[in-house]
């Protein structure tokens, strides 16, 4: 995450480690430079930020000057706020193009998405409270980790509140972290209890 005066920016990544590290390293170098061509400080809005990050990603994964080497590709999610503008969240693809959240789909995912997506599709709405949205994200991670052993902790949880221009909460959760362990158990127990209340088939009465 990056927070300075008039802006707070959070960047997530998945994909090729070399490309992701190159992007993060170049972003830091541009921030430290006295006269950068572009940096997170000079971008006027999140479209410019997404284009800047996309350009860096494309530079690293573009091995022949024309096409992106998919083995070197990384995806990024960038979110946050610039003073005087609304909060933003965007997904940046390896070729440098990007999309933003919408009313129809007010969330974005990186990495292994299929196991945790159903809960997000069912529950995430724009009117959801920040706390409920965070719990939903953790349940999504929990579902993914139960179905795919290649996905595991730590889970880095970052909370940004609109117009604060700083990270209000930052946690790193493990399986045995009391809060996460309690959340995981209650979600599993709740699903089992709810499953027992589902309607019966007519033919079950014959058994």
Q: What are these regions, as identified by a protein language model?
A:
Residues 1-207:
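N-terminal nucleophile
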